Amino acid sequence: PLAFAGWFGMNNLKVVTPNPGSPISAFGKILGLYGVGLLTSIAGVWALSVMNMWLALPITIVLTVALLRLIPGDIKPNIKNQFAIFSNKHTWSMTVLYILTFGSFIGFSAALPLSISVIFGNMMEVGADGAMARVVNPDAPSALTWAWMGPFVGALIRPVGGWISDKMGGSIVTQIISVVMVVASVATGYVMMLAYNSTDPNSYFALFLILFIVMFAASGIGNGSTFRSIGFIFNQQQKGPVLGWTSAIAAYGAFIAPRVMGQEIQAGTPEVAMYGFAVFYAVCLVVNWWFYLRKNAYIKNP
């Protein structure tokens, strides 16, 4: 009943789509956008089956953007205006930094339970012939019990990142959390390697979980700082589309992180995934410094 009552007095709210036209016209616009998503999703699934993930994803993204550009009708001028963000170099720098923060947060949310289940769900056992083999860990920690803690901390601390950024500047906060994530990623990878090859992986679980929570906290704070930076760097017309674009690209972290983690765990080298993430975070350090913190930065400390 409260949900129905909530509709009364809300006729002053604007619709999501400005000037939607007739119901048939509005439905056509929505159907067209969904159609683009469906076609590119099909193409992406096919591309992923025949080529490397690092090629399939960019192809899918470029195809989606290209098809959106071809949508006819009165929606086209609005899309064209939004596409102006791609000529701004800060769109690309902030895309990289948003992958660092939001992409890591959403990616680790999927990768953490996978890591707990596979790395700590099994253990090494010495056979009668002296050979090592992986067997089920009878006292394995449950992913359902522990995996929620990381995303919870990251989501809870995000507003703190925005508040600190208002005081210090978003880029300084982003730089600090980038350093934290580089160090924590390397440390987590090392602990994962020890646990994966141990006859007692449970002895490493507490440290493993703490390090992951540190990365979640850093990515949550960084999510607040990069959000603040986008609002500072871009004008009123561009910051909305930029935020939508960076969020959409960073959301691929939910696919990439667990996939990379799963591949490396299957290969017996889970630490390689974390070391790879650490390299990316180091690149983000350089990007953030070059664009926003060096002496002659394009925009100083947004």
Question: Which residues fall in each region the model found?
Answer:
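Extracytoplasmic gate region of multi-pass secondary transporters
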Residues: 37-56, 88-155
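C-terminal membrane-cytosol helix-exit motif in multi-pass small-molecule transporters
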Residues: 1-19, 34-76, 285-292
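Interfacial helix-cap and linker-helix signal at transmembrane-aqueous boundaries
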Residues: 47, 116-117, 164-165, 260-269
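Juxtamembrane cytosolic amphipathic helices that cap and anchor the N-termini
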Residues: 22-37, 84-101, 204
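Multi-pass alpha-helical transporter architecture, strongest
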Residues: 6, 10, 191-192, 276-302
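A late C-terminal transmembrane helix in Major Facilitator Superfamily
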Residues: 233-269
